[in-house]
């Protein structure tokens, strides 16, 4: 018995929506970064789902989806490390983590 496609796609959309909601409503920079990572995980889940379910109609696209997912994971790791470095610099210079209070990064 095969899992219907709308289960993993729904979960991916839910993860993306939750990440988007959190990134737009939070004021803490670390939380915003975490919600952006949740959004990227939702995108990765949808990529793998489409690869799994449509490999018969387009085998070359099915082979590219895991590679694209690894690329997205690599970019997400780089984005997280740069984002955490910026947040750490913001805390050292301004003493705040809230995005609203840190309007200038000049220091």
UniProtKB/Swiss-Prot annotation:
GO cellular component: NADH dehydrogenase complex; plasma membrane
InterPro entries noted in UniProt: NADH_UbQ_OxRdtase_chain4L/K, NUOK/Mnh_C1-like
UniProt-annotated location(s): Cell membrane
Predominant place of localization: membrane
Molecular-function annotations in GO: NADH:ubiquinone reductase (non-electrogenic) activity; quinone binding
Residues passing through the membrane, by range: 3-23, 30-50, 67-87
Keyword Kinase included in the entry's annotation: no
Membrane topology: Multi-pass membrane protein
Pfam families hit by this protein: Oxidored_q2
Recorded catalytic activity of this chain's protein: a quinone + NADH + 5 H(+)(in) = a quinol + NAD(+) + 4 H(+)(out)
Gene Ontology biological process terms from the UniProt entry: ATP synthesis coupled electron transport
Documented EC number(s): 7.1.1.-
UniProt keyword terms in alphabetical order: Cell membrane, Membrane, NAD, Quinone, Translocase, Transmembrane, Transmembrane helix, Transport
EC primary class: translocase
Family from the record: Belongs to the complex I subunit 4L family.
Cited function: NDH-1 shuttles electrons from NADH, via FMN and iron-sulfur (Fe-S) centers, to quinones in the respiratory chain. The immediate electron acceptor for the enzyme in this species is believed to be a menaquinone. Couples the redox reaction to proton translocation (for every two electrons transferred, four hydrogen ions are translocated across the cytoplasmic membrane), and thus conserves the redox energy in a proton gradient.
NCBIfam families found in the cross-reference section: PRK05715.1-2
Complex and partners: NDH-1 is composed of 14 different subunits. Subunits NuoA, H, J, K, L, M, N constitute the membrane sector of the complex.
Name of protein: NADH-quinone oxidoreductase subunit K 2
Source organism phylogeny: Bacteria, Bacillati, Bacillota, Clostridia, Eubacteriales
Gene name of this polypeptide: nuoK2
């Amino acid at each position: 018995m095969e899992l219907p496609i709308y289960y993993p796609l729904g979960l991916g959309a839910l993860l993306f929506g939750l990440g988007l909601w959190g990134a737009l409503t939070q004021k803490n920079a670390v939380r915003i970064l975490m919600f952006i990572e949740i959004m990227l995980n939702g995108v990765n889940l949808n990529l793998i789902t489409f690869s799994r379910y449509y490999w018969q109609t387009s085998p070359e696209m099915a082979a590219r989806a895991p590679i694209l997912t690894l690329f997205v994971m690599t970019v997400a790791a780089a984005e997280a490390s740069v984002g955490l470095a910026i947040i750490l610099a913001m805390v050292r210079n301004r003493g705040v983590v809230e995005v609203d209070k840190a309007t200038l990064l000049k220091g």
